[in-house]
Amino acid sequence: NVDLIKLMITGGVLDAKAKGVPGELKMKPEMVKAVCDKAHALGYNVAAHVESPEGVRVALENGVDSIEHGAKPDDEIIHLFKENNAFLCTTLSPALPYALFDRSVSNASEVEQYNGNIVFEGIKECAKAAIANNIPVVLGNDVGCPWITQYDFWRELYYFHKYVGVSNAFALYTATLNSAVMAGIGNVTGSVEAGKCADLIVTKNNPLDDLRALRNVDLVMARGRLYNNPKFKTKNIVTKELDKFCLLYTSPSPRD
């Protein structure tokens, strides 16, 4: 069954042919509007991959419900977010390796690293502006991109705290309940409440004190079924390189 429509309104880092032009517009505005109108008529929300200010503007002007990634916003873009009650899905994980890894590790070209920095900074600035303007933000990690795995989503929460400057509590809320609300299932899951699905994880240490506690999961409860001490395959090179950006930690953030 279809749950959501996703558009690729812009390109990204890997298909940009020159420095300074990541997120080139790939869909005409009238095409975006036609898809959104049809999807909404059928009861579906529309998300859009967007990595340039022009792409964000085209998406929001033509009915997109959530922006995946984002780009540095101006006042007009902030207004469009609010006018459309749109969400922002912040995804620092896919941009970080291209922006911050040594190119001998990432195998990125000089152009890809340059544009990776533009996208990484744009995602950060979009998230900060959205939070400052009470625009709802959720988290994603764009799994399937290089250096992104299925088993360590906790890193996205950590990056959100480290690079956007939110509290640990806000990062947890953004990744759970707010994300469930965006997906249209906030009445079913996303928080521990009577009447909702028993979906939660248990960790030995408290992620409110240090989000890296989420790395070691002792128990998963999914729709009431228990999975004790879950095990999964990992990629050592991925862990080694990504851990370099998760080891420098200041004092625990306030529990607000």
Task: Give names to the regions the model predicted.
Residues 8-125, 138, 144, 165, ...:
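Active-site core of metal-dependent hydrolases
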Residues 41, 45, 106-111, 120-206:
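His/Asp/Glu-enriched, well-ordered alpha-helical/loop segment
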Residues 249-256:
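Conserved small/polar residues in nucleotide/adenosyl-binding loops
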Residues 1, 5, 39, 67, ...:
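Divalent metal-coordination and catalytic microenvironments
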Residues 53-54, 155, 209:
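Short alpha-helical
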Residues 175-177, 194-240:
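C-terminal cap of metal-dependent C-N hydrolases
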